[in-house]
Amino acid sequence: VLSVCRAGDEIIVPRNVHKSVINALILCGATPVYLNTETDSKLGIVLGVTVKQVEQAIIAHPKAVAVLVNNPTYYGICSDIKGICDIAHSYGLKVLADEAHGTHLYFGDNLPINSMKAGADIAAISMHKSGGSLTQSSILLTNNGINADYVQTIINITQTTSASYLLMTSLDISRRNLALRGRQSFAKVTEWAQYAREEINSIGGYYAYGRELINGGSVYDYDVTKLCVYTRDIGLDGIEVYDILRD
């Protein structure tokens, strides 16, 4: 965010952005233009944003310099990030991707499109979530539309000068493992997740949702590796299930 926004700029973001995005806006002085996302009335989860929503926001806010997209959300919901990239670029805006939960999208043939392939200008990827590196370690990917030297300057300003070699080593080991075995590993993960989803749904009373949520708009695609189970039909909410499993 600090690499593309200045004080007085506007940036188009969905309502369910991570708090780190808000913190970055506070630091750089840019103003968020919020996109109101739909919520699934049964599951209670926030869905994605549509290309139409993004274009309407761009037209209404000529001071906007960038669009930020979650790809995917914590619950596996994906917006049409390629369509968003295409429309944003046609108006001269940069596209930033919060791909914290999408490391594996770069290593699966049957998974939603990753942000770099979709045309995003910059993407933050939390390798420690599904890539196997140590907690706190992540990587930042940039396309040709981003000044890499300026990004490095921002990193130097905001991060420690005493970087953890333990974290960096874990990133490199995980990078190598993904490069050599990522596709095979996530093919198995996808298979196991789908098997678990089918078994859970066969029990009755539970609902492990999947690609049936796709509607071409607010749910443009779905990350099947996210195994989420709805339990309200048996009278339990998530906190209660959490306590039962811990006990």
List where the protein language model places each region.
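Active-site phosphate-binding strand-loop segment of PLP-dependent enzymes
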Residues: 43-104
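A short helix->loop->beta-strand "cap" motif at the edges of active sites that frequently abuts
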Residues: 9, 90-93, 120
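Active-site PLP attachment segment
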Residues: 112-153, 159-170
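Structural signature of PLP-dependent enzymes
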Residues: 174-197
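General beta-strand structural signal in soluble alpha/beta enzymes
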Residues: 13-14, 34-35, 68-69, 95-99, ...
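Conserved C-terminal alpha-helix-loop-beta "cap" of PLP-dependent enzymes
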Residues: 191-247
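Conserved PLP-anchoring active-site segment centered on the Schiff-base-forming lysine
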Residues: 5-21
